[in-house]
Amino acid sequence: VLEQNKQFGIGMNNELSAVTFGFYAAEELTAADGSVIPVDGLIEIMSLDENGKAVLKSDVPFGSYYVKEISTDSHYILSDEKYPVIFAYAGQEIPVVELAVNDGKSITNEMIYVEIYGMKKDEDGKALAGATIGLFLTDGTEPILTTVSAEDGSFSFTGIPYGEYVVREIAAPEGYVMDDTPY
């Protein structure tokens, strides 16, 4: 499950396609052909479908395994947690076995949040208070958020999902000309 942020349009654009998990042996195992799978041996890299499910294509012996995230979308924190998987005998009449990871509970990816800050100065390099600054998506025409520069010219946007944005003045203080240069 990916954390979503509708305001910034993150988590609803097939970000799951960037998530992969490794399927590892949690104990030394012997395969049907006699080969040994070592502890922490990577057996397969699995991609997620649009529903967040993965399919293990390898034939594996009964035993203890774990999955661990190998890659994720750039907006999210890559987890180093190991999620246990137990593969027990289900009867020889069962051609396909469904394995539950993390006791069947969803694995959640947490978003990376950042702060964007800057200084507004006049043409002489002096701090400029009262400028309205907008934060835009790189292809956006309307600001996602706005703020006003403080007495020392500083401004900031906090709790912003990691990504690429444009910062631009959208209203100048009285007596000044607006600088709409995108940064």
Predicted feature locations:
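Solvent-exposed loop/turn and edge beta-strand elements of beta-rich ligand-binding domains
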Residues: 1-183
